Amino acid sequence: MTGIYIHIPFCKSKCPYCDFYSFKPDETQKDSYLKAVLRCIKENKSQIKAPVDTVYFGGGTPSFFGGERIRAVIDCIKENYTLISPEITVECNPSSVRDEFFEIISKAGVNRISMGMQSAVDSERKALGRLSGKDEVGSAISLARKNGINNISLDLMLGVPYQTMESLNESIDFLISSDIKHISAYMLKIEEGTPFYKMQNSLTLPDEDTVCEMYLHTVKRLSENGFEQYEISNFAKKGFESRHNLHYWRTEEYLGIGPSAHSFLNGKRFYFERDFNSFLINPAIIEDGDGGSEEEYIMLSLRLSEGFSKEKFKERFGRYPDTAIFQKAKELEKHNLLKIENETISLTPEGFLISNSIIGKLLE
């Protein structure tokens, strides 16, 4: 199975922490971009040999693109690719969705939405540049459900300005009471070139130890309320994991369309140049080397709670992994950073906090 990612590089306003490629467009630019995306979908038809089972509209703010344009993209994908029981996700900003939007995309086949809540505390949302309050998030959830979209994911951000354990619990309470199916919980990362990067010395942020405590607390509370952690930053009710993102973490194939969108097809990684006008006129594809190596497979497998399996590695590469990996893992297991069961290595929540370091030690 293959996934298709559609990048919508449009936002009503830029959040101060965001490093993704996006800008505020006019209606003419939206229409021009739609034409370019439809053309690109058709031109890349020959690249995909397997059926498509996920389509993901990310951004930017796909909901700012408009329901009719999203429907046109989905219709084009259906006309040019074989879709089998697809999970079709659209990222939404609560401030840019209305009843009509959900009605249009639901009829087009969208069955999952992901909303950038970040925090349910309005003072924290304001510091993050969010245009809507907590009540608008709740209203957007209700509108989605009214139009038959019940698979809803919300983002939660840890370590944001002014956040405390008390305010974090307020956000978690909101997530749990909303009865949603999926939660992505990310730690705030200050990216170079963003307003937060310039402001970082004046931001009131929780210290690193507190953020780590917040992460472990979030894992515990979500687990107690029916959410299974299936990846470092992702939690789902049973059967509601993001099928599209699992393509990435399981080194499965996917096609990315749009400026800055990445692809992995036929063992090769490539991406489109991070330039809107270039994509409209003559999309420049930049090769990014081979993908799916043994090392990459191990690294991505260890992001998942299911972990790195000796037998699955053999199925993939025709041989067992180096025994040294399991020898090193036994030492780390003593410190509750990972566990070894049935010849499978998986990280604990404490291990996820320092996953880059652990993976580096296992592979060195």
Regions found by a protein language model. Give the residues of each.
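Minor-groove-contacting beta-hairpin "wing" of winged helix-turn-helix DNA-binding domains
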Residues: 344-348
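C-terminal scaffold of the Radical SAM
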Residues: 1, 22-43, 53-319
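Short, amphipathic alpha-helical interaction segments positioned at domain boundaries
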Residues: 350-364
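A short, conserved structural fragment
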Residues: 333-343
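N-terminal [4Fe-4S]-dependent radical SAM core
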Residues: 1-5, 48-51, 81, 354
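Short amphipathic alpha-helical interaction segments
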Residues: 319-331
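Local cysteine-cluster metal-coordination motifs and their immediate loop/turn environment
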Residues: 9-20
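Alpha/beta-hydrolase
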Residues: 6-8, 117
